[in-house]
UniProtKB/Swiss-Prot annotation:
Family: Belongs to the thioredoxin family.
This protein's name: Thioredoxin
Domain of life according to the entry: Bacteria
GO molecular-function term, one example from the UniProt record: protein-disulfide reductase activity
Leader sequence segment: none
Pfam families: Thioredoxin (PF00085)
Species per Swiss-Prot/TrEMBL record: Rickettsia bellii (strain RML369-C)
Keyword set includes Transport: yes
């Protein structure tokens, strides 16, 4: 299951992670975000040993989304070795996201 990450825990959970990290930036009021949630949960289970999957509520945590230029949600961002590798904006299908993750880790 995808865990939550906050502005305060981001450095430890994401930038210092030994595994690549997928961060789903979302908000309660965002319908496409709610549609993406079950897909993110499935990816979290399917790729558990390869990728850490985290979710960040942008309304509760405005600092990190601002730092990384999040302007639309849902946005998923992939980090590896403490660096941002790639970003996808909008609602995507599970297979498309898994292929994208595998190509970037």
């Amino acid at each position: 299951m995808a865990s939550n990450v906050t502005d305060k825990s981001f450095e430890e959970e994401v930038l210092k992670s030994d595994l690549p990290v997928l961060v789903d930036f979302w908000a309660e009021w965002c319908s496409p975000c709610r549609m993406l949630t079950p897909i993110i949960e499935e990816i979290s289970k399917d790729l558990e040993s390869k990728v850490k999957v985290l979710k960040m509520n942008i309304d509760e945590n405005p600092e990190i989304p601002s730092k990384y230029g999040i302007r639309s949600i849902p946005t998923v961002m992939l980090f590896k070795n403490g660096e941002q590798k790639d970003t996808k904006v909008g609602l995507h299908q599970k297979n498309s996201l898994i292929e994208w993750i595998n190509n970037n880790i």
